[in-house]
């Protein structure tokens, strides 16, 4: 199943890591381990952020996705299960509508 992981980086320690020249290597190490389907870095509420699409085969792996961001950046992580159009088609919405209407 696919999951969206939203990451918000506080200014510190990120700014210090940028000044030290180590932030790039830390992010590379995390991404090498995370292996996201895709990831985009952006601004979120005035701070740095990222949105990743991750394939989750085993829910017990979720801490391994977020802990590197928590421990290296004091970041906040949010998770949302995501469906493709094909997944949504398999959801049986018509039947659910009939059952619960």
Task: Please report, for each region that a protein language model flagged, where it lies by residue.
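Conserved, structured core segments of small domains
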Residues: 1-101
